[in-house]
Amino acid sequence: MDRLHIIGAGLAGSEAAWQAAQAGVPVVLHEMRPRVGTFAHRSGDFAEMVCSNSFRSDDDERNAVGLLHWEMRAAGGLIMATADRHALPAGGALAVDREAFSGAVTAALRAHPLISVAEEEITELPAEGHWIIATGPLTSGALAESIRAVTGAESLAFFDAIAPIVHAETTDIRCLRQSRYDKGETEEERTAYINCPMTRDQYEAFIDALLAAEKTEFHAGETAGYFDGCLPIEVMAERGRETLRHGPMKPVGLTNAHDPATKAYAVVQLRRDNALGTLYNIVGFQTKMKYGAQTAVFKMIPGLEQASFARLGGIHRNTFLNSPTLLDDQMRLRARPNLRFAGQVTGVEGYVESAAMGLLAGRMAAAGILGRSLPPPGPETAMGALVNHITGGAVAKTFQPMNVNFGLFPPLDDARGGRRGRKDRYKGYTDRAKEVFTAWLAAQA
């Protein structure tokens, strides 16, 4: 039987190896640590949690990441089973003892009879064989260059230029829908943007808050240089109080239907971020403000006072593919179908999301080697919604890493509005997802 080779023993690679081996496929897991280290990792253990010890909410009834936990447990995931065994008290969240967790994952993989570990750095994309690349945001320079050569110069990013993403349903009716200069051939195109106009006083107060907000510093190993194309908004504001008004907040080409005679002093634009139209990103608002400061400052924008954020902004090093243009729904590189990608390098963000994509990639690769066909789970599920987002549901031109959230799910037919309705709707999402995911697993039995 052919072997499956996996590059990277992070959360995605570890889960992919486990799933494939459990399906009966021999696996070679290639990991460069501890021989070649990174500035972030502290050990040679697998599935090392670098940034925090939290897998976030464990509520599988009304939280999208909790639902993802449920799906991974249902699928026999190694990462979730190990996390449960090494869980710490954390309220409604799932947090783990990091060292015990990664040590246990390492022990389980090394003990599996179908998994062999090769402690070596892979510097080029292999031309033959079955491979999963799960090298994460700190992909080594040599391999990153090989990926860039195969996928194209614009396909691999080395810094996130992350703008905040808002749940569209939480924007206020005062916000107006219009493309700048009414550009577009269809009504949908001409109303593609949500616009939030500001008076001069509102703009000045916003700039004051932006300049005073607490910012994060670059981590060790990150360059402090910025690309002009993705300057943080606070850096732009530091260059002059009017800079933003002549940049992403310029008020030209837009009219206020509520008050046509009054011109806005500045305008914040939100652009659709997914095909469903449930998520919008704040255009040009990449930032390194701390999360608490972001929420306070961005809620000063007229119409966003009650906004719910699917993701807050940030700029930090992250190697990821423009997956919607490169990967098929089997997570294979279209140009080289023997190569699958999994984890954070595909453009998902978060420990759980990365491991979930590893779970899918491992199962899909094993099915292919065994001569079977395995479609992804439906987009009604958390895993299916994520893989759909990274392989076609997202807008390729503005693609950025994404956490799982209900904005990625197809809407429910009988959803109600309001706070109480939102809780019922989330429960509706999870009930539907569990039914669809259970059927997907049963079809593989």
From Swiss-Prot:
Q: Which SUPFAM superfamilies match?
A: FAD/NAD(P)-binding domain (SSF51905)
**Source domain of life:** Bacteria
Of the GO CC terms on this record, one is: cytosol
Q: PROSITE patterns, per this entry?
A: GIDA_2 (PS01281)
Name the Enzyme Commission number(s) assigned to this protein: 2.1.1.74
Q: Name one GO biological process term.
A: tRNA wobble uridine modification
Where is this protein localized, as stated in its record?
A: Cytoplasm
Q: Does the keyword Cytoplasm apply?
A: yes
Keyword set, alphabetical order: Cytoplasm, FAD, Flavoprotein, Methyltransferase, NAD, NADP, Transferase, tRNA processing
- List the molecular function annotations (GO) for this entry: flavin adenine dinucleotide binding; tRNA (uracil(54)-C5)-methyltransferase activity, 5,10-methylenetetrahydrofolate-dependent
* Similarity annotation: Belongs to the MnmG family. TrmFO subfamily.
Protein name per its UniProtKB record? Methylenetetrahydrofolate--tRNA-(uracil-5-)-methyltransferase TrmFO
What is the organism of origin for this protein?
A: Rhodobacter capsulatus (strain ATCC BAA-309 / NBRC 16581 / SB1003)
Q: What gene is this protein translated from? A: trmFO
